[in-house]
């Protein structure tokens, strides 16, 4: 079966969701629709090696994550980037000042990291737009490379076999030109673009 329908007409999702999560017990899957700001819930059951699921409903959810069901875990966007030692890094959709989450080999959260790429003076407690910092994320060995689309910035992090995270280097290639209006990050007309291609 299908978890959802996609399109501009009636359906559970208006576009492909970029948020997913599971309940602590793994019996419920959540998918977030960015266009409608609704969180769709599905009951999941595995029996005789078959996966079945049913739509439970949806509820409005604020962009900062308020309204998420208690116990939702594995909050991330797009694909996970997996390192050679089994650790993974996911881009955070709902966050408060950090961009990434480091997961262990069993996809349990280890820590959050990666500060927002704008001056802290521009932000307040209601600013949660981590999606503005999305970009290219690649791995090589146990190294993780990040180059955002909207900022002339690049960074490399290493993760040890014990899960210790270290920033090896970061570089700014251009000065961003941004402002915050009504808690929304605004890129000015003269803001230099970041990266849309990266190879390691």
Where are the regions a protein language model picked out?
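Surface-exposed loop and turn segments in beta-propeller and other repeat-based domains
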Residues: 1-15, 54-72, 110-129, 166-190
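Structural signature of eukaryotic scaffold interfaces centered on beta-propeller domains
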Residues: 20-24, 74-85, 129-141, 191-200
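Structural motif
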Residues: 37-43, 96-101, 151-157
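Conserved beta-strand positions in repeat-built beta-propeller and related beta-rich domains
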Residues: 31-35, 90-94, 146-149
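Beta-propeller domains
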Residues: 139-164
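Short loop/turn segments immediately following beta-strands, especially the blade-tip
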Residues: 41-52, 107, 157-168
């Amino acid at each position: 079966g299908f978890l959802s329908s996609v399109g501009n007409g009636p359906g559970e999702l208006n576009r492909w969701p970029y948020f997913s999560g599971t309940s602590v017990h793994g019996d419920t899957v959540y998918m977030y629709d960015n266009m409608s700001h609704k969180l769709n819930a599905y009951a999941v059951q595995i029996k005789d090696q078959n996966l079945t699921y049913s739509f439970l409903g949806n509820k409005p959810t604020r962009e900062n994550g308020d309204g998420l069901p208690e116990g939702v875990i594995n909050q991330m966007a797009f694909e996970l980037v997996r390192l050679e030692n089994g650790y993974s890094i996911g881009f955070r959709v709902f966050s408060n000042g950090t961009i990434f989450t480091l997961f262990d080999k069993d996809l349990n959260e280890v820590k959050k990291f990666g500060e927002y790429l704008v001056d802290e003076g521009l932000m307040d407690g209601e600013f949660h737009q981590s999606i503005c910092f999305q970009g290219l994320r690649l791995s090589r060995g146990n190294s993780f490379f990040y180059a955002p689309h909207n900022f002339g910035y690049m960074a490399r992090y290493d993760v040890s076999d014990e899960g210790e995270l270290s920033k090896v280097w970061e570089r700014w290639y251009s000065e961003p030109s941004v402002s915050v209006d009504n808690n929304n990050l605004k890129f000015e007309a003269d803001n230099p673009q970041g990266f849309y291609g990266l190879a390691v």
